[in-house]
Amino acid sequence: VTNARAGQINYMDGMKMDKSCRMLQATCAIPMLFPAIEIDGQYYYDGGVCEPITIHKAEADGYHKHIIILTREKTYIKEKDKSNELAAKILKRRFPNMVKPLLERHDYYNAEVAYCNELEAKGQALLFRPEYPLASMEKDIDKLQDGYDMGYQQAMRRMGEIRAFCGLTD
C-alpha cells in the first residue's frame, strides 16, 4: 500500500489483517475514486501509486526467478494521466508527499515494465500479458470472464515453458 503522508510504499503483513479488512481496502483505494484508508493512525492508498509492479520487493526478499502477470498488452505505454494531475492538485494540501508519485506514476510503471522485460531477456522471468486490451475498471461480467479465460488459456499453452522455468520435470 502507499502511505499517503509519506508518499512511499509500505509493505504490510497480510496475516495481521483486522476484521474489517482495512488493509485489503487500502490495496484498492485509488486516489480520487476512494478515500484514503486509515490503519493505526496512518492513511493509505493503493500500492500501485508508488510501486506498480512489486518486482524489486521480490528480489529484495531473495527471489531470483519470477512469473509476472501484467495487466496490459505488450505494446502498452502508460501516458501522463490528467486524472492523476487532478488527484495531485486535490490531495496536495492534505497529503503533499502524494503529489510526486501521482504526477510520475506513468514513469514508474513504464520503468517497471522495462525492467521486467530485461529480466525476461536474461531468463529470470516469464511474463504473461493480455493478448488484447482490457479495461482496468471493467464491470461487464462477460468481458471479465473473457479476460480470465484468455489468461487461463495462455497459461495452458505455455505450461511446458512454465514447468521448465520452475525446474519441474514430467
Go through each PLM region and give its residues:
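Patatin-like phospholipase
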Residues: V1-D170
